[in-house]
Amino acid sequence: MITVALPKGRIAEDTLEIFRKIFGSSFMFEDRKLILEEGNFRFLMVRNQDIPTYVTEGAADIGVVGLDVLEEHKPNVVRLLDLQIGKCKVCIGIKNEEELDFSRSELKIATKMPNITRNYFAKLAVGVKIIKLYGSIELAPLVGLSDAIVDVVETGSTMKQNGLKVAGDIMQSSAYLIANKNSFIIKKDEILELYQKIKDEISK
């Protein structure tokens, strides 16, 4: 049996749809259940940020997680495949009437992705003070907590609704299939067979 960690939300639904097309089974989580067993698979419904931990620690053989999460945490996993779902961007956001002043000695940036943020601004030789937040990132510049934010953006509508604009793109992201390193040795044939089936399905 292969254990698969999925992030709650649309990416989980899109991933299960790929499995439905490949295997012809229902692959539906019952209401509020966090574990689904179907055929040779056991699916775990997990918070997006926790997927690398489940896979790294071996609680799941494989997982589906955003590239932004992989780049932020750099987990010791095997990156197998870009699933071409959950596409988004990591962007800099600022207030509509402002521009980002890179000449300042230090910019205050609110984000839940401190590593991506720090690395990006380091390449620009811009000093930053990271304000680590876990939600409602858009609020920070509106109340003077930060000069700008770094956040995941799909359509940009949340920023617009809160009087912010995109001031720059840091990276593109989409959902990746990853594997635990030990599982990739012990269950290599099963995982590679699944990898090939998924690759064939998403390239149709």
UniProtKB/Swiss-Prot annotation:
Database matches in InterPro entries: ATP_PRibTrfase_cat, ATP_PRibTrfase_CS, ATP_PRibTrfase_HisG, ATP_PRibTrfase_HisG_short
Gene3D superfamilies: Periplasmic binding protein-like II (3.40.190.10)
Pfam families, alphabetized: HisG
PROSITE patterns: ATP_P_PHORIBOSYLTR
Cellular component terms (Gene Ontology): cytoplasm
Keywords of the record: Amino-acid biosynthesis, ATP-binding, Cytoplasm, Glycosyltransferase, Histidine biosynthesis, Nucleotide-binding, Transferase
Subcellular location: Cytoplasm
Substrates-to-products reaction catalysed: 1-(5-phospho-beta-D-ribosyl)-ATP + diphosphate = 5-phospho-alpha-D-ribose 1-diphosphate + ATP
GO molecular function, one term: ATP binding
Chief localization: cytoplasm
GO terms (BP aspect): L-histidine biosynthetic process
UniProt EC number: 2.4.2.17
Pathway: Amino-acid biosynthesis; L-histidine biosynthesis; L-histidine from 5-phospho-alpha-D-ribose 1-diphosphate: step 1/9
Enzyme class: transferase
Top-level taxon: Bacteria
Subunit record text: Heteromultimer composed of HisG and HisZ subunits.
Similarity comment text for this entry: Belongs to the ATP phosphoribosyltransferase family. Short subfamily.
Role, per record: Catalyzes the condensation of ATP and 5-phosphoribose 1-diphosphate to form N'-(5'-phosphoribosyl)-ATP (PR-ATP). Has a crucial role in the pathway because the rate of histidine biosynthesis seems to be controlled primarily by regulation of HisG enzymatic activity.
Record remark: domains: Lacks the C-terminal regulatory region which is replaced by HisZ.
Protein name (database record): ATP phosphoribosyltransferase
Source organism per UniProt: Campylobacter concisus (strain 13826)
